[in-house]
Amino acid sequence: MTRYLVRPGSRLAGRFPVPGDKSISHRAVILGALAEGVTEVEGLLEGADVLATIAAFRSMGVQMEGPDKGHLRIHGAGLQGLRAPVVPLDCGNSGTAMRLLAGVLAGQPFPSTLVGDASLQKRPMGRILNPLRAMGAEIAAQDGRAPLHIHGRPLHGIDYALPVASAQVKSAVLLAGLYADGQTCVTEPAPTRDHSERMLQGFGQPVERHGPRACLRGGGRLCGQALQVPGDISSAAFFLLGATIAPGSDLTLEGVGINPTRTGIIEILTRMGARIDLTALREVGGEPVADIRVRYAPLQGIAIPPRLVPLAIDEFPALFIAAACAKGQTVITGAEELRVKESDRIAVMAGGLRALGATVEERVDGAIISGSALLGGRVDSHGDHRIAMAFAMAALVAQGDMEILDCANVATSFPSFPALAQQAGLLLEVASA
């Protein structure tokens, strides 16, 4: 078992980029594989999740060179060029890979099976099964969970209203729509990341967007592109947290994607009193990008507006720590989606904070966190990469050393986290049990 041993009392400083965006990296691989011609990707995240997506398409006959230092060359097979895999496609720990691949595979003229690790096989897949089946897909899954046994069939377009805001479900339906007769539309109840819509248009697939509604027509074609993946704001979030809570910190993160559907972490921390400045604003690969400077600032507890929850859904482990370090109470509501992530993030974060001496009232859709001094001690991340990184940053202000258990899955999204954290000043040691 991989453990993090972290000593308190340091600060974060320096200037460096964070790795490529995981969500965009997945989509670059998928659309590059389905496009005609060559797609060149720079800045690709080489984490285990994205590597699982690459391996899946290689199993379906797509030729790729790399990845090597963030560069991947994809020789696209075209929308109709995938070949039947001879083995199950292993998505590892990646819900994004499984849900988006299900959308692609639903319309293929061959059977396929999607599997994952023990954590992924506990996550709900009914949310993609329902719309894909409504489009004509034949998918077998026990209790709405992986493994997914998909028998490709001709699909027809649907007009689908998402019951829960989910970019993964939206993307799965739109990808299936590429293979469907007629128009496929998705309406979301709250804004979610729009990387799929942006990238589909970049690859030549028209997407009509009207407020919460996105529509496309099947029967088109995608054309290979040259793509630059911006830095991942979800990875940057841990450094935004650390520099905000550790006195004397002054840190600049270069080339971070600031897509407005992903910047909830910045808005929430700013509402709490964080000193965050965006500089060198520019556009990279159709996505807004900036350098982010963050300095220490005392935080004040707030009631987080529910409308911001989908815009920061992956960053809540960091926000739980920020709340514990703030003066007063922070109230989180409308965040029940956190219970079906890589772990039950509400329960695991609440339990971890209590182990460090914090006062947390857990609720079905969130929590009330009272700011207090954090003790040292042992915290179990339950194999959740984002929880492991959040508690590593909490150690900056703990009153004693911290040991964080079960950290190996950090490699799924941020394999260079320990090295970058050490470079920035975190007194972190990686150990094996």
From Swiss-Prot:
EC number: 2.5.1.19
Keywords, sorted A to Z: Amino-acid biosynthesis, Aromatic amino acid biosynthesis, Cytoplasm, Transferase
CDD domains, alphabetized: EPSP_synthase
UniProt keyword RNA-binding, yes or no: no
GO cellular component term, pick one: cytoplasm
Active site: D314 (proton acceptor)
Catalysed reactions listed for this entry: 3-phosphoshikimate + phosphoenolpyruvate = 5-O-(1-carboxyvinyl)-3-phosphoshikimate + phosphate
InterPro entries from the UniProt entry: Enolpyruvate_Tfrase_dom (IPR001986), Enolpyruvate_Tfrase_sf (IPR036968), EPSP_synthase (IPR006264), EPSP_synthase_CS (IPR023193), RNA3'P_cycl/enolpyr_Trfase_a/b (IPR013792)
Localization in the cell: Cytoplasm
Chain sites annotated for binding phosphoenolpyruvate: K22, G95, R123, Q168, R345, R386
Recorded metabolic or biological pathway in which this protein acts: Metabolic intermediate biosynthesis; chorismate biosynthesis; chorismate from D-erythrose 4-phosphate and phosphoenolpyruvate: step 6/7
Binding site for 3-phosphoshikimate: K22, S23, R27, S166, Q168, D314, K341
One of the protein's GO biological processes: chorismate biosynthetic process
Superkingdom: Bacteria
Pfam family, one: EPSP_synthase
Example GO molecular function: 3-phosphoshikimate 1-carboxyvinyltransferase activity
Family: Belongs to the EPSP synthase family.
Protein task: Catalyzes the transfer of the enolpyruvyl moiety of phosphoenolpyruvate (PEP) to the 5-hydroxyl of shikimate-3-phosphate (S3P) to produce enolpyruvyl shikimate-3-phosphate and inorganic phosphate.
Family annotation (HAMAP family): EPSP_synth (MF_00210)
NCBIfam families tied to this protein: aroA
Quaternary structure and partners: Monomer.
Protein name: 3-phosphoshikimate 1-carboxyvinyltransferase
Species: Acidithiobacillus ferrooxidans (strain ATCC 23270 / DSM 14882 / CIP 104768 / NCIMB 8455)
Lineage: Bacteria, Pseudomonadati, Pseudomonadota, Acidithiobacillia, Acidithiobacillales
